[in-house]
Amino acid sequence: MVSRFGGRGVSRRAVWSTVGRKLALPLLSFGLFASLAAPSRGYGESKEQPTTAPPPTIQAGTDSKAGSHALLGAVDEITRKVVAIRGLPMKSTFARGVLTRQEITLRLKERIHNDYSPEEVRGEALMLKRMGLLPVDADYEKLLFELLSEQVAGFYDPYRKTLYVADWLPLDMQRPALAHEIQHALQDQHFDLKKLARPLKSEGDRQLAQAAVVEGDGTAVMMEFAARGMGVESAQLPTVLARLGRQMMQLAMSTTPSLQQAPAVLRESLMFPYAAGLEFVAAVRADKPWSRIDAVFRDPPVSTEQVLHPDKYLSGERPWKVTTASLTSLPQYKELRRDVLGELMYKVWFSRAQSERDAEQAAAGWGGDLLVGFAQEGETLPLLVALSGWDTEKDAVEAEQAAQKLVQNLTGKSSDKLPPPGKSPLFERHSGDRSFAVARRGQKLLIVCGVPSVSTSTVVAEIFRSWNAVPIGQVAP
């Protein structure tokens, strides 16, 4: 094994390919925090969880479970190494335990049911289905639990102050997995993970951005821990890690069929805190000490845009503010849910109708947005209104074209010819008696889904008249 990058006979790419393949599976499995915060889009306020419940009793076991028990005995040793890497001293001890897959699934359900009511979960599912991001007949909660219970192989619970190791994790992955979770315990002692993990009502994009800090920091520490164990020097780690997140996720996808088959909205939400978070932490840290990331915990990014483009975090660029009003033209519709999609989810949404690269480019000019769902009694799917602001009019035109392709896709009319860029005051397609439409006014872009066809023009005019989207500008972090 080489002792530094670029050593004779072994390239930097080969070294990190080895590390990446070794860690690809557990990289997606850490942190109950992000696994729950990311897929759920931020509806509802969190209720404090009990902190007095004892950790599960550790039973004697065999095979991988026995290995998990043995690993728990190495917590103190691994903690010392993590503290040396990251520089956050341990303020107090934390409990530790081993959970079966069934026990972890129960913990996942407990956490989600505590944070979200059945009505909130149902409302979120209906909006995702109207957006075309979930099959209409999908059981959203079942999909969520199946994916999470398969991926979560260990976690630190900030409510119980307890670190858990899964009994099925292969032994060669357990030490870096434990290093990641120990870092979460240290984060909790210094920055209060309960505060960062608490669902943010109507701010799912901001919640994902905060999750990226927590998981990006944990993943970067894990990578450095693994690199040192392989004899690799860490001086150039920030530079390498700043480009490694996407490669790591591609490796994880290739070894995890369930992720490949999962709806893109769940897959991207689950992966984002680790992949983009790793690259964000590495880019912000650059050649600075780890204390630079301590400052990020105290003033975390407020949007996935800031995570995807660290320069926008460093310059303090803030999302646009979107204000709304009731739909007087459709008084029978009542508000169901609202949320900020953010650059990441616009990319996911646009990618339904075009390549991921083109969707990423179209979403890159995102400035701010708000998605509001309206429901009428007796209807299966809600009416959606998505108003967004874009950095420049050119960016808005590019997003408008992506939205037109999306509307064609949602209505089964992808073969229709698109109008010239920026030349359609109202782009509308129909599915039965429902309209899906796109309209732009300067840097503001409107997408409506599921509007009664006879009301489309009236609804669009009302939204541009009574709703608004304005840039906030820059606020130094």
Give the label of every model feature segment.
Residues 24-37:
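Bacterial N-terminal signal peptides
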Residues 82, 176-193, 218-219:
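Active-site recognition of the HExxH zinc-binding catalytic motif
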Residues 91-112, 202-205, 236-246, 299-302:
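Acidic helix-start/capping segments at beta-turn-to-alpha-helix junctions
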Residues 106-119, 139-160:
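Catalytic zinc-binding patch centered on the HExxH motif and its immediate surroundings
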Residues 163-178, 209:
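Short pre-active-site segment immediately N-terminal to the catalytic Zn-binding motif
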Residues 188-247:
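Post-HExxH zinc-binding segment in Zn-dependent metallohydrolases
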Residues 250-382, 387:
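Pan-zinc metallopeptidase signature
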Residues 370-477:
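C-terminal soluble interaction/assembly domains
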